[in-house]
Curated annotation (Swiss-Prot):
Annotated family: Belongs to the ATG12 family.
Cellular localisation: Cytoplasm; Preautophagosomal structure membrane
Keyword Transit peptide: no
Region called Disordered, residue ranges: 1-52
Name used for this protein in its record: Ubiquitin-like protein ATG12
GO biological process, one term: autophagosome assembly
PTM description: Acetylated by EP300.
Amino acid sequence: MAEEQESALQLPPSTAPEAEVPTEVSPETATPEPPSSAAVSPGTEEPVGDTKKKIDILLKAVGDTPIMKTKKWAVERTRTIQGLFDFIKKFLKLVASEQLFIYVNQSFAPSPDQEVGTLYECFGSDGKLVLHYCKSQAWG
């Protein structure tokens, strides 16, 4: 059996506010920042850097929807479902008028503004989030 390839999903930046540009600070006005709590005491909480990592999503076709050759993708936690809609439509070369539905665990359609990271925390299993996509309404 061929091993599934994992690809990094390259989507355009989300509509979130732009990152602030660091400003230049002179040595006289610079004040040292206190160390973060994760750096001071190792606890059960994850460090802040771990929340920025990408998560794996598994995209499965339903019905007569074309199957993607690459099914497993690494996606930023802050990506929205709308970003996935746009990516899948572009990847499958669907016409803008064609509908696309995404379902979590074959049960419900998440809101377009829902972040993938939140869905992963609630419904992810085995280190990945399984999403089903189709061109016609299938569940719920």
